[in-house]
Amino acid sequence: MKIRNWSLVFIAICILIITGCSNIVGNEDQRIQVQKHIDDNEYKDFKMATDNNEVLQVKKILNDTTFENKKVEMSRPADYHFIFQFKNPKIEAKAVLYQIWISPNKDKIEIIAGDSRYVQLEGKHAATLFQIVTGEKLVE
């Protein structure tokens, strides 16, 4: 009987420890800090997207997108770039820089994540991501 009681206490302690440590950093609220290209390699703070649903929507689009692992050379600096930041200043994480180029027809966007992940987005995903990040609309 004593062994059974001790095993129940041990299991209860393990469950408390596991649930206490399961606050994954990915569940923390984040915001998107956007900068716009204004001059040769110079960017200016443009927008801060703080709505958690919009941030999650952008993260979902990026996570569902298949990036190519290749180094690309663009003919001009990115039109915009953005990073995800935690709203809680005590959380430190390495930020990935996402750079956005708008196509000449303004119907698709090209994104480079970090140094070597490239994708071209068009259609609904491009329009949604661009609208949330910049507050502007792509031509549909």
Predicted regions, residues:
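Bacterial N-terminal signal peptides that target proteins for export
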Residues: 1-8
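Acidic/histidine-rich, surface-exposed loop or edge segments in extracytoplasmic proteins
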Residues: 35-44, 112-114
